[in-house]
Amino acid sequence: VLGPFHVENGPVLENGADTCLDGKGEPLVVHGKVRSVEGAPIEGARLDVWQCNDDGFYDVQQKGIQPDFNLRGIFHSQKDGGYWFRAVKPRPYPIPDDGPVGMLLKKLGRHPNRPAHLHYIVGADGYEEITTHIFVPDDIYIDSDAVFGVKESLLADFIKVDDPVRAEKFNVANPFWEVEFNFVLAPKSG
């Protein structure tokens, strides 16, 4: 699910950069590897990431309130396929429900809420691009996502870390959240 809040040409950031520009939320360190189906690391894979802020809004929904490109960034995997960045633990939020979508949800007796998640578009030269999310598994809406985007393979372990040494290593406040998520890219056919 791409969703309506993706922005083309987001800021290209170095690994380890902090995407949170409004200072709200619980610190989160996100890391993982990008590999081929054979398990080889993919250097230079492009990871376009975005999420809502701690109030449940994307920057494009709050122009003039949130900084532009808040909680957005484009990262490139390192030689070992690794990537990492700093953000905030995602929150659930309601999708806009003041139009036809809202009427449909009401008729179906469904709520408009999405469980907490991070968005990714991941691709590399010679590989198929994937558009996906990773979800917080214990979110209240995990079993009733308004857009039916949750799959078991997209549930990630968001772990609360209380370790001043690790917090200093990642340049985040202690305690903080940490999530590791790895991607496997298939080669382009033809």
Predicted feature descriptions by range:
Residues 1-190:
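Beta-strand-dominated extracellular/periplasmic modules and repeats
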